[in-house]
Amino acid sequence: NIVDSTSIERNLYLTTQLLELGTPMVIAMNMIDVSRKNGDKIDMKKLSAALGVEIVETSALKGEGSVKAAEKAAAAAKNRTTGEHPHVFTGSVEHALAHIEDLIGGKVDPRFLRWYAVKLFERDEKVVAELKLSEDVKKGIEEAVSSCEKEMDDDAESIITNQRYAYINTLMQNAVKKGKAKGSLSVSDKIDRVVTNRVLALPIFALI
């Protein structure tokens, strides 16, 4: 999993999704030379411990760390090494996901149990059709999701998105210190702020 260290927040969002697949992973923290030049400080040990995966610093432009990252990835795949799932979700959302896991236990590969639970929480139609769940199980899932939506006054997909970003924000506070002056954003950061804005994102994509 290649992570752009200069846009780490956006990249970590995808990382949280990939971790739910239960696939052996090594993170290649790319463009680390640019991050250092910007004065950014990333505590790789803290980040690695929190995510449960090994992190290798790389610079594709300078050809640094790529071989080591590839070797680590090959070793992880060979040994089927997977870390524990990070605690991305909390409170009633985690409770609902755990309940969904109980409802579908035995129906899916245990490695992918959390991924399926999240997709069912989001009411992913393709996943629902794929699993061919009984009406009783579907009802139990819907009750768990609806209860969360009512408690949090939001829709299921937004709840998942918001909790991912809340988790990433905690990671950033604990393991990442930006070198730029407070309030100074890179071009990439500015673009991220706009395209991930819940109000502006849809009109922007509609125009594209």
Language model: regions and residue ranges:
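Residue-level signature of catalytic and energy-coupling elements of molecular machines
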Residues: L18, N30, L47, A117, ...
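Conserved Switch II/interswitch segment of TRAFAC-class P-loop GTPases
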Residues: N1-T15, L19-K41
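Cytosolic juxtamembrane amphipathic/interface segments immediately preceding
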Residues: K177-R193
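Short flexible coil/turn linkers enriched for glycine and charged/polar residues
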Residues: L21, A49, L185, N197-A201
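Alpha-helical transmembrane helix bundles of large polytopic membrane transport and channel proteins
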Residues: V26, R36-A181
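Core alpha-helical transmembrane segments of integral membrane proteins
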Residues: V194-I208
